[in-house]
Amino acid sequence: QGAGKTVCVPGLNCYSCPAAAGACPIGAYQAVVGSSKFRFSYYITGFLLLVGVLLGRFLCGFLCPFGWFQELLHKIPTKKHSTKKLKPLTYLKYAVLVGMVCLMPALLVNDVGMGDPFFCKYLCPQGVLEGAIPLSLVHSGIRAALGALFTWKCSILLGVVVLSVVFYRPFCKWLCPLGAIYALLNKVSLFQMKVDK
């Protein structure tokens, strides 16, 4: 609840989280694309372009709560693995952006012309971490309604948690559509993030 959830924040931040002060731009974009009276979302697109051009991938490393969560997990002492040999997986996030965020909510609609937020509903682990788990802990009605989708999302979250311990921010690198947008805009951003060596 709250009026602040009508305003996007620059990181992956599920609006269903009880403590969320703002909306996730990916979730907000899917809500507009999947609405029965779809109109191009100038606000969300403009917001993403503005923060992407100003800050680029800086956002992913310093302002995204899910990126920070993965970084904390990576600090757990264990053998680490490089993602260099897995570089082709970085292109998955662009497929997720085009397919699950842009096309599927607009094209796969129900009888009243509304599409599901496919990325948020079926893939995003942030929603189950910030929203579903905390809400189900305090509301028995929500606990009673949990089913196969919750189990699926928890499995994705568990996979990301395990991978984050051994790989550096795997979800950000391989699946995050917000990271895909910021990676594209990083080439023209004022704060370009580059790896020296």
Walk through the language-model features, giving the residues of each.
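Non-ligating segments of multi-cofactor redox enzymes
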Residues: 1-197
